[in-house]
Amino acid sequence: MSDITTTIPPDDASRKLTVANPDDADMRHLSIAGGTYTILVTGEQTAGRYCLTDMLVPSGGGPPPHRHDFEEMFTILEGEIEFTFRGEVLSAGVGATVNIPANAPHSFKNKSNKAARLLCMCTPAGQDEFFLSVGDPVASRSAPPPKLSDAERFERVQRAKALAGKYRTELLV
């Protein structure tokens, strides 16, 4: 019988407990891809291990096809989301968890007639910083997205394309 010992590092007392409520006034809410994304837990809070985002996706909302070099996991809290993964389409409803492997092409869309809500965890962290770089701040999770002209929408897409590589992401549009 082998004696396997694992040494667990000491507690890092500089790291604090994180309690996040998406409706708290100090949360950062961003309008992205037609939805409202609330950054619940940042990479800074987890020493880069992961980030967690609450996504409110309206009917018809969702990002374009893309891929990145990190894992992305979604848990559906409300509604139904249609995922496209390597060209295959899959619908996921309340309670389902969908894991997207690193580097795999994918997208998602809310095809229903009501808003959907999901949690998105990325590991390692970094997607939170991408969202903060490309999103438009909004006052709350339920605030409407800003009314953008066609030129402003085009500028947002160009900004996302320009910054994607910095955040280990490739937009496939």
Regions found by a protein language model. Name each.
Residues 20-21, 80, 87-105:
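Short acidic-glycine-tyrosine-enriched beta hairpin
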Residues 36, 73, 80-82, 89, ...:
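Structural motif
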Residues 46, 82, 102-128:
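Ligand-binding loop in jelly-roll beta-barrel domains
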Residues 58-60, 95, 103, 113:
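Tight coil/turn sites that cap or link beta-strands
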Residues 52-59, 67-85, 121-122:
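Short, conserved beta-strand element in jelly-roll/cupin
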Residues 1-49, 147-173:
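A short, N-terminal "cap"/entry segment at the start of jelly-roll beta-barrel domains
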